[in-house]
Regions:
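Short, conserved acidic/polar surface loops in the N-terminal third of protein domains
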Residues: 14-16, 33
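Short active-site-adjacent helix-start/loop capping segments
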Residues: 11-12, 30
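A conserved helix-loop-beta module that forms one wall/lid of the active-site cleft
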Residues: 25-59
Length: 138
């Protein structure tokens, strides 16, 4: 689940972050793979979100053990590269329920061909066109 500190009162944050993701690791019997992956990426100089562990309780009821992960957004970009301008895509598979995957393969010049595999989260302008140009160059 995601906690958005600005959802009801604008300007709120926790440790200067507007959002945090709580991942329950239901597919990871060790509960540590995600955090280790982010730590290895950081050690290798690869941009990665900050992560930690938390034992979560809600109104006194234990909810379980979670990996808490920084939201990939403009704040992450500003902290990581000193610039929050430009395009931010969430790449994955089956956003639209089909067989499309975010493989960075050129699919054609129609932006609709990319919308099931990529989710444009942030852009200044021409986000889809720049993604198409990027895949064409590969």
């Amino acid at each position: 689940f995601k906690v958005d500190f600005n959802r009801f009162i604008s300007g709120q944050s926790y440790d200067l972050l507007k959002k945090l993701n709580f991942n329950n690791g239901f597919k990871d019997p060790t509960f540590v793979r995600e955090k280790i992956f982010y730590d290895v990426c950081e050690a290798a100089g690869i941009l990665s979100p900050r992560a930690t562990f938390a034992e979560v309780t809600f109104n006194g009821t234990p909810w379980g053990f979670y990996t808490v992960v920084e939201q990939i957004d403009d704040q992450f970009l500003d902290r990581s590269i000193g610039d929050d301008e430009g395009h931010l895509f969430k790449a994955g598979s089956n956003f639209g329920g089909g067989d499309d995957e975010a493989s960075l393969v050129y699919l054609g010049s129609d932006t609709v061909l990319y919308e099931n595999a990529y989710d444009l989260k942030q852009t200044e302008s021409n986000g889809w066109e720049d993604l198409i140009d990027f895949t064409l160059a590969g």
